[in-house]
Amino acid sequence: RGDRPMKDSGIEWIGEIPAEWTASKIKYCTEFAPSCNTSHLSEDSLVTFTPMECIKNGYFENREAHFSALSSSYTQYQDGDIVFAKVTPCFENGNIAIMQGLSAGFGFGSSELFVIRPQSINTEFIFYYLQNNIFKQYACATMTGTGGLKRVSPTFVRNYSVFIPSYEEQLEIVQYLDEKCSGIEVLIAKKQQHLTEIESYKKSLIYEYVTGKKEVV
């Protein structure tokens, strides 16, 4: 876009932002911990059920369970909601996903999940926004609790500043990040496959020499 007019965001760790972007907060552009209407579900309805290990790096495993088997102690969400971990180390490890294609359009998950429902912001844009390192660093600084049960402050999440471009630019940014991140994931997968092959070779090498299949010459 070339040189574009910039303005002070008013937040030291963000600095300048494009002049036409508007300042908001998560609690204003999304519903935080929204309610879900389950009146259309029967006890036998199959809904999505996602323990914490089913959610990672933008993906989730769509397990199913009967609606009647799931208690109110679980976190509820519906199609289009974004869920992400509130507890360490799952928060730092990227347990976040957009919940789409849910069984019966509805799901239950760990009680250690935050849920937001985008309103005046593109879902994929805020999804990427929540994965930036600055958000994670400041969120971790708000954690309270002991040992492995430290949790991010919900007040921090609700009041976290979001700077919003036009809807058209949000779509452009999302498309660009989708393409770039997809390419990066392919590279990671290839690297992981290479590491797996090397590890397999290492194990085979050890086995062959300690069992006498080969000898040192």
Which residues make up each language-model segment?
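Amphipathic alpha-helical coiled-coil/heptad-repeat segments
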Residues: 1-4, 161-217
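Non-catalytic DNA-recognition/assembly elements of restriction-modification systems
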Residues: 5-39, 159, 171, 194
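Short coil/turn segments at secondary-structure boundaries
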Residues: 6-8, 39-47, 141-143
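Proline-centric
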Residues: 15-23, 113-124, 155-178
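Sequence-specific dsDNA recognition surfaces
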Residues: 27-39, 45-82, 98
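A short beta-sheet element
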Residues: 73-133, 145-147, 153-154
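Periplasmic-binding protein-like
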Residues: 135-138
